Amino acid sequence: MNTGARNRRFARLKNFALLFLCVLLCTPGHAEGVFRIVAYVAGWSMPAVIHPEKLTHINFAFAEITPAGRAQLANGELEASLRRLVALKMTNPRLKVIVSIGGWMADGFSDAALTESSRALFADSAVDLLRRFSADGIDLDWEYPGQGVAGIKYRAEDRQNFTRLLEMLRSKLDAASVTQGRTGAGRYTLSIASADREYFDHTEMDRLHVYLDWINVMSYDFFNSLTPTTGHHAGLYRAAATVPTDRDADDSVKQHLAAGVPSEKIVLGVAFYGRGFAGVKPIDNGLEQPYERFEGAHDYSELAEKFIGKQGFVRYWDDRAKAPYLWNSASRTFITYDDPRSIGIKARYVKAHRLGGMMFWELSEDRNDELLDVIARSMRSK
């Protein structure tokens, strides 16, 4: 064989090998008909018992960004918690443990995303974090690019820089996957926690989604201490007593789809906690009424033990929003939450719209797995 022919044959073999590697590397971890069940687990509130067989992914919350722009765990307690979660893979080898960076009031993103060098530094540190703890991917919970609502540093250019940061992370994670022989469903993953409306004004969802394996849509907290009235904080649809400020999970999903996000990349978030409002105007059982005080959050286990059908609280169902709520007429207290019925309906919505699965915040708030069992059963049934 002459040198030219040998070189051409080598080139064809090389191209075939590269193509084969790309197919292996780029194979998505979400197979047809297999839905993700993504649990956020807070390092400061680790459940005593975790059933890994009920989950596909655990998002460990949270790593932080140092003033120097590196991703790290803040202390030894968080490191021990992450190691405990990674050890669950011995029970469920298919479980993926993801390190989530950020969270509410977590600063550092705007600086980390600012320049090519700062993005590379952050991405390299994120990869090092995965290697050190044998974790499987990175999740970014930046609340929020281009907005100072949580009191963090922000810039107008966060909109473009967030996309550039995700592009850098994708490149670094893919390179590390190749180096470590992680292919197909085993490659390092990249996801984000997203919101709706204003979030889309300050991000390039139509461009950034190509770098992501999936998006955890935070379709909750629609009504909170910043809204003037009560309402369903995690309603699937708008309430029967619709007000102009109403937001809902279905609208959030449609925004992502309109931006070009493939349906299988959309993971619908549900809440394992409720939100309370006191001094509520006593009309329509407190739904979408002005209030005097925001009373914060109640985890679902607390609601089940102390509030639902107890202490004067009556459960109501809004069939338009597909959401439950509690009303105490004596204390004029309104509580909005998700329950097994509403979560079961959301699970059917996920399957009907061919979404990528369900996510929830946060595992320790459902101590008896009452809500998780609905998700696990629904996502795995035909």
For the regions a protein language model found, what residue spans apply to each?
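Substrate-binding surface in catalytic domains of secreted glycosidases
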Residues: 38, 67-80, 145-305
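Aromatic-rich peripheral "rim/lid" segments of glycoside hydrolase catalytic domains that contact
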Residues: 364-382
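N-terminal secretory signal peptides that target proteins for export/translocation
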Residues: 1-11
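Conserved, mostly hydrophobic/aromatic
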Residues: 58, 99, 140, 215, ...
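Bacterial N-terminal signal peptides
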Residues: 16-25
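Glycan-recognition patch characteristic of GH18 chitinases/ENGases
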Residues: 32-130, 147, 157-160, 166-168, ...
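Sec/Tat signal peptide C-region and signal peptidase I cleavage site
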Residues: 27-31
